[in-house]
């Protein structure tokens, strides 16, 4: 078994008087849904050394000691004048506290919401601070006259980008990143990491695509050679393409036919983490999300989002046995604005009790709203199973909205083309996959051999399938080929609706493949596969995988085949 590389800090000059310090974790760092591809990550920090020294975005608590060690090897930290913060959270606060102990002379530079957060997490109302609202500059000398661009969104209301005209580097914090760890500092061969960037966008940016478009408009005013991102490779070679992609992905969200208003507040970040996973489930099903942090939103913004939405989901922590005041205010707006034919959902985290979720749920039930998923209550921090449940709940919510719209739309006969496409037949199979504590499965008939050497195949996976999360490049799965004559039982089992995070393999005879995925013991044959790449194909992903192992379990059996008459459904 290969050993995991230890966490470290990679240091490299990236421009005139400018250095990156990349704190690297080679394994999955956190349980948030954005890290689910499990390719590790980097927390990128930057040092600009003009006549004065500025440090940008020190990493979170995981890297505190190794980061400060690396920093002290390269300079006297008492010479640092400024620490510029793209956003502030409790995780980053641990590093800031440790830095202040050895460099108490520091002045912090942040947005106005960031200043409020910073004073709170550091428990110091008298911190020396420069607040940047978008018009101020900070002259470090030697041409490094920094400019600041507030780019707030519901998840990061304090988001602040920094631009250095001397190097034409734009420090983008959460924008344009990816959770990948490697030796490559820049994005040479950028097309190979597009999948990771798209996943990062879908998890972090899609729920507030409107604010992303506003940020892109602001950033377009600055001639830029390099995006100095908060995570993953720095963007130099594919900068134009990635900027265009962010535009396209955001426009897909803002022009969607159906929208869900996701309204929440978060005390310690746990409810926000749940909101992010639910939003990911909704958007992957082709429904847009308007994310609103009601701690920072004005009543009219909440009212407008609810009015235009097809449904709404509310999330709240429980503080002192109650929902926070901003949540109670938002609930009042929802009850007075949303007609009760809109679909509703409720979620929240708590420490000792969960009265906030109960309160919201009871108020909505009394008002006659239907629920798109059972209310979600999570004690303390969510884990990967909890986040899978949240993502699948979001997908169920979106599918219910789409189904309701479809029912209202008059069905039309299949066209000649659709009837012709329906004559394409495919083997009946079940895709099974397991990653950590998460497992999933789906019935599949859009399967084809794709290569002889290496032996490879393609599978079309609908974007809103739960198993889609486990079919990214590098993932492993098993393709179970069903046997004619005994396939109906397995077919019916895997066609039935499953609840969020429900065990797909209950009452099914399985064994474990070498790659860790379940093998159906009643299958005709099975193939152990490794995903090499995938292509976006309309409402599906076309997944290409190579076959690493396999076995025929019944030499006399015949493959079950799925016959259709229309190509507009399965």
From Swiss-Prot:
SUPFAM superfamilies: Flavoproteins, FMN-binding split barrel, Metallo-hydrolase/oxidoreductase
Residues in Flavodoxin-like domain copies: 260-402
Annotated stretches, region: Zinc metallo-hydrolase: 38-231
Entry cofactors: Fe cation
CDD domains from the UniProt entry: flavodiiron_proteins_MBL-fold
Protein EC: 1.-.-.-
Record protein name field: Putative diflavin flavoprotein A 6
Natural source organism: Nostoc sp. (strain PCC 7120 / SAG 25.82 / UTEX 2576)
Lineage, opening ranks: Bacteria, Bacillati, Cyanobacteriota, Cyanophyceae, Nostocales
Gene that encodes the chain: dfa6
């Amino acid at each position: 078994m290969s050993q995991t590389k230890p966490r470290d800090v990679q240091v490299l000059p990236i421009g005139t008087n400018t250095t990156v310090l990349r704190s690297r974790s080679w394994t999955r760092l956190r349980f948030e849904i954005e890290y689910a591809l499990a390719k590790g990550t980097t927390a990128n920090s930057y040092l600009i050394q003009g006549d004065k020294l500025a440090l940008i975005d020190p990493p979170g608590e995981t890297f505190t000691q190794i980061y400060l060690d690396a920093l002290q090897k390269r300079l006297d930290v008492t010479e640092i004048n400024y620490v510029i913060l793209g956003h502030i959270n409790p995780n980053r606060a641990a590093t800031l506290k440790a830095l202040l102990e050895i460099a108490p002379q520091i002045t912090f530079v942040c947005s106005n919401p960031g200043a409020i957060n910073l004073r709170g997490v550091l428990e110091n109302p008298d911190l020396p601070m420069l607040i940047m609202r978008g018009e101020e500059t900070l002259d470090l000398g030697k041409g490094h006259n920094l400019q600041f661009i507030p780019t707030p969104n519901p998840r990061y209301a304090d988001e602040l980008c920094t631009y250095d005209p001397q190097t034409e580097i734009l420090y983008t914090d959460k924008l344009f990143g990816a959770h990948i760890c490697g030796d490559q500092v820049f994005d040479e061969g950028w097309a190979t990491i597009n999948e990771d960037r798209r996943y990062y966008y879908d998890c972090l940016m899609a729920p507030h695509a409107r604010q992303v478009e506003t940020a892109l408009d602001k950033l377009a005013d600055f001639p830029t050679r390099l995006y100095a991102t908060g995570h993953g490779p720095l963007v130099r070679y594919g900068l134009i393409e990635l900027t265009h992609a962010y535009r396209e992905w955001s426009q897909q969200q803002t022009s969607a036919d159906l929208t869900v208003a996701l309204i929440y507040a978060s005390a310690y970040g746990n409810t926000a983490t749940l909101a992010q996973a639910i939003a990911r489930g909704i958007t992957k099903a082709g429904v847009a999300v308007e994310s609103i942090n009601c701690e920072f939103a004005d009543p009219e913004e909440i009212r407008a989002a609810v009015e235009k939405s097809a449904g709404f989901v509310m999330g709240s922590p429980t503080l002192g046995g109650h929902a926070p005041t901003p949540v109670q205010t938002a609930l009042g707006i929802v009850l007075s604005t949303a007609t009760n034919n809109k679909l509703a959902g409720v979620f929240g985290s708590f420490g000792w009790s969960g009265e906030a979720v109960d309160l919201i749920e009871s108020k909505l039930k009394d008002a006659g709203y239907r629920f798109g998923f059972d209310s979600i209550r999570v004690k303390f921090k969510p884990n990967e199973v909890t986040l899978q449940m949240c993502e699948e709940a979001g997908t169920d919510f979106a599918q219910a909205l789409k189904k309701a719209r479809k029912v209202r739309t008059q069905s039309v006969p299949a066209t000649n083309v659709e009837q012709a496409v329906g004559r394409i037949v495919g083997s009946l199979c079940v895709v099974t996959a397991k990653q950590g504590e998460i497992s999933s499965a789906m019935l599949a008939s859009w399967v084809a051999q794709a290569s002889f050497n290496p032996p490879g195949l393609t599978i079309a996976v609908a974007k809103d399938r739960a198993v889609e999360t486990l079919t990214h490049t590098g993932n492993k799965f098993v393709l179970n080929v069903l046997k004619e004559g005994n396939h109906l039982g397995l077919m019916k089992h895997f066609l039935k609706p499953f609840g969020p995070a429900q065990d797909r393999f209950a009452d099914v005879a399985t064994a474990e493949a070498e790659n860790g995925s379940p093998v159906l013991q009643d299958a005709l044959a099975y193939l152990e596969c490794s995903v090499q790449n995938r292509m976006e194909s309309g409402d599906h992903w076309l997944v290409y995988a190579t076959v690493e192992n396999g076995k025929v379990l019944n030499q006399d059996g015949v493959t079950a085949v799925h016959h259709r008459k229309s190509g507009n459904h399965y």
